[in-house]
Amino acid sequence: DPPRNALQRAERDQEMKERREKRNKLFEQHHLDDSGVASRRRRVTLWEQQKGKCPFTGKELPANPLDPSLELEHIFPEDMGGLSVEENLALTWRTVNADKGKRTPLQFAAKLGVPFDQLMAHTQEMRWSAKKREIFAWGAIKEDRGDQASHYNPDGALRIPDFGNITRMA
């Protein structure tokens, strides 16, 4: 909601300043300035949001988010209509990314033979938005129920998630 008065504007400005300072400290820890390569800054930000864990395996990632064994992964695959936006990106190992391939997390869980709830449990402690969690769980809702629409078209094809008013990252 937009600020309604000077006090709310001041509070919002202070929150923005604190977030900016926190982000800058995080980048400084990894020797990146604010003009650093966007993909490197994005990896650091995602590592922080994920609390240093892989959302697909639940295992600890290397302490350095710039480790060459890690890469950015599209949660909802690009080949299926996924966008390169923060809400659709996760940091994981190259090997996990290759194994997941062009699958949604739900399809990847089926490939691994693990319950999807187990994959979702990996994300519970992560600092993810509701939108990112929705994208991660895309495909789980097979038919309309209450206020939740099916993730599938009438012909059974998986719909593309609504990425909303999100700015592309790449």
Predicted feature descriptions by range:
Residues D1-K59, G82-V85, E125, S129-D147, ...:
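Short, charged surface segments at domain edges that flank catalytic/cofactor-binding sites
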Residues P2-P3, P55, P62-P68, P77, ...:
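Proline-rich intrinsically disordered, low-complexity coils
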Residues S35-A38, C54-G58, P65-E71, A90-W93, ...:
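Generic ordered-secondary-structure signal
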Residues R43, W47, K51, P55-G58, ...:
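Short, well-ordered alpha-helical packing segments
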Residues G58-L91, K100-L106:
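Histidine-centered nuclease catalytic patch
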Residues E87-A170:
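Domain-exit/linker segments immediately C-terminal to small folded modules
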